[in-house]
Swiss-Prot record:
HAMAP family: Glycogen_synth. SUPFAM superfamilies: UDP-Glycosyltransferase/glycogen phosphorylase. GO terms for biological process: glycogen biosynthetic process. This is Glycogen synthase. The keyword Glycosyltransferase applies. It catalyses: [(1->4)-alpha-D-glucosyl](n) + ADP-alpha-D-glucose = [(1->4)-alpha-D-glucosyl](n+1) + ADP + H(+). The gene is glgA. Gene3D superfamilies: Glycogen Phosphorylase B.
Amino acid sequence: MLPTLKKSGRPRDARGRFIRHHERLPVSLADTRGALFVASEMADFIKAGGLGDVAAALPRALRHRYDVRVLIPGYRAVLERAGKVEIVGRVLAHAALPACDIGRIVQSDGLPIYILLSKELFERDGSPYVSTSGSEFEDNAIRFATLSHAAAQIAAGHAGLGWKPRLLHLNDWPCALAAGYVRWSGGTTPCLLTIHNLAYQGLVPYSMAAALGIPAERVAELEFYGQMSFLRGGIVNADHVNTVSVSYAKQITGPAQGCGLDRLLAGRAAKGALTGIVNGIDASWDPRTDEYLDSHFSVNQWQGRQANAAQVRKAFGLRESTGPLFAVVSRLVHQKGLDLICEVAPQIVAAGGQIAVIGGGEPEIERQVAELTRRYPGQVGAFIGFEEGLARRMFAGADFLLMPSRFEPCGLSQMYAQRFGCLPIAHATGGLIDTVDDGVTGFLFQHASVEALRRCLERAFRTFRLPSLLSAMRRAAMLRPSGWDVAGKKYLSLYEHTAATAPALATVS
């Protein structure tokens, strides 16, 4: 049984940890402007990726200027943590999309959350998107079209809530079709679509168009190489599209990272309707107070890092060492460049370094990592899986974070590492370009190749042997602004821009 969210006290995330947002400003809704933030996951209740963290943090960062409310599906984990849910509205059936009640809870910090209730669609085991066996739910198209349609109905004032948003903020493919449902019904509510990862597009066969309630004359808006793409439909119909970093917004307009949508996105960019905003990270990532650390430290007091490094070495079965400790906190998949790490591991060990790996993913890469631990006992250690406290201690104790991702829309690990004084060694792509200042707050290499990574590692080893330079870089990394207050201000401006430049504003009640 998963824990129930308490009615009082600070809100907790899906793992039961306190959500702490030191940058959250006092809530004043005298100048109220409504925004509905629609997401398929939220770390308060359930999380499958970085979107869950954003959905928990960004609405809270905006509430001093907007009446932001969140809409999420009523997964089993959500209902178990939500406590008592008040039924406040209902959306009607549409084509094959079932009617659903809308529940409402208010988090202890005052954030209102609407929950789309459907036992048939959402109350099941597994993650938001896949079953316990790891396969996608066969009815995902119906599930998330229902979420999208509900958002459009709320925007139109047809859900009985007594409230209409001035703007819809949609996130990734599961919510993208809401922009289409708004437009296809003649609605004018401004829609902002945030793309967290363009690689996931919500592809479904054309044969489902009628079941999803897509007008026959608008099906072409979703066309993607013989299928329909929820994400493409959102990009076409949203008033503005943004991504989670400035560099990623530029990269997806080209064929290398455009995932087949580059021409469409380039067209939106040419009209000023595609921008990028780097994500923030939660205030709980603070080495002075982190609840998972036994030894705290700060930019002016480093001793705690040594104690954390010793804990990490012990946890991973590594020998005591005065050499650099390299951390890998990642899904073990090709996209994250884990094959490159496996190739350079012998060089790291030969130069006196050690490697600690935490994560899970593709069986072949897991096998390669396991082989490295057998080949270099005491120098390479791995934990296949994930454990939050251990990951945080790795950031707090390691000298360098290996992050050679082939593409990275934003990335959070590099910012977590920087906050804890662990210097990222990263491929210059997407959000890594925007968050790692080469030679100042970490190290970047330009090509996702073994040779480029090797040369970057040589720079890192040279820096490690210069204590004054290493300390200066750690300090710069720890002091880099990365909280949600920075991103929140940019989203507030984007909300205003989207509302002001939409062809016609909805009548706000």
